[in-house]
Amino acid sequence: MSFKTTKWTILTLLLASFLLVSTAAFAGTPKETSEEAPEYVELVFSDWHLAEPHWEKALKEAFVIFEREHPNIKIKLDVVSYGEKETKYTTEIEAGVGPDVFHLHAYSIKSFIEKGYVYDMTPFVKAEGPGFTDAWYSQTIELMKKDGKYFAMPGDFMAMVLYYNKNLYREAGLDPARPPKTWDEFLEYAKKLTRDRDGDGKIDTWGFGTIGAIDPGFELRFTPILFSHGGSYLSKDNKCSALNTSEAMEAMKFFNDLVTVHKVVPPGVTAQNPGTVRQQMANEQIAMLLGSGWTPPIVDNNNPDLNALDVLEAAAVPVKAGTSPKFSTTAWLSAWMISPNTKHPEEAWELVKFITSKSMEEKWFKDARVLSSRKDVSGEYDELLSDKFAKIIAAELDHAKFVPQLKEWPQIIEAINTAAQESFTGAKSPKRALEDAHDRINGILSVYRTSSDKCPGF
């Protein structure tokens, strides 16, 4: 074989080898691409419960399950305080950012819907098929809607009840099996429970703890007192304040007198929020408070030595003596929403659906003792129905009424919260403070009145 022939043979073989390798490499490209890890979607989840250790643990456990079931979704946690959540979400949503999924007290729903701060979930709800929403109590589902569209999904649903420390009852000579049924009895109990327990000559335990700070939690503590006195916040058509009624004035005076006249509430009430009042209960500085399913586990977490799950008892909210009002307490309802700014609405819906599923709602009760807006949980879950606190709360739902569902409600309740604070501090008399709140609320509601509509004076 000549040198020339050999050279061409070698070149031919090299070229063939190159083409073979190149073809194999190119042929392998689709396979390699298909094996690449899928792109992750990150959802920002925001909830005030993340600031509560027992809830934080429960939520993190749940998200491990969710991420395992949805490997293309990762959850990023965004902590917010209960008192700051509305301000935070409003500011962020207005700026075009904010969490993908967030949690609110139901009284903010109307305001957030009106302002366009929530994503329309209707297509997702309808895609779940007929009967999907039948698992929830109808009144809770209705509050999530506007004009037939769904803008949120219900979460916790509970009545406010009276919690008390049975050991402090016994020390004061009271029978824990006989909680007060009327506000007169309640005051009598509170006076006996307000005493010096350590013998230093100074009061160190008070009968009752409540909220006096300007705080969203005020509504849940004052409303049972108002309703159980037969009062209302607004007229039946929601066009005028109803604080000028004798029932409302009596309720506000009673609330104020607990602090300023009878002194059965610890000093410094105007600085107290839900968290600090629960801490007072954990420290045995107070013997009674108004709360709901969240109260025992939080108090227990604040002071495990108290053994709150055993020491605390629950009872119906007292009523005005000689009356039997149809509604004697208020209902707490929370809502899960999707931000209108989310870039991943389908994935956000999957998270909301997961959070509000039957299995997760059972977990929330098991871990945080909150009742559910799902009938197949609050009405059927054996562990809930046998719990000493939950069965009282569930029974009181028949006597619980929601506050008026208006977008102006946050402004309205703040006016009443301010009136309570003014009367506590002595800046105004209870009557004057309530009158000013009455006038302020009528001003807020003027948008709903025509020139012929007149509101009664105070």
What are these regions (language model features)?
Residues 2-11, 23-117, 126-134, 176, ...:
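Conserved N-terminal structural module of periplasmic/extracytoplasmic solute-binding proteins
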Residues 139, 143, 312-317, 365-418, ...:
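Long, aromatic- and glycine/proline-rich binding clefts that accommodate carbohydrate-like moieties
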Residues 187-192, 237-269, 313, 317-320:
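Glycine-centered hinge/linker elements that transmit conformational signals in sensory
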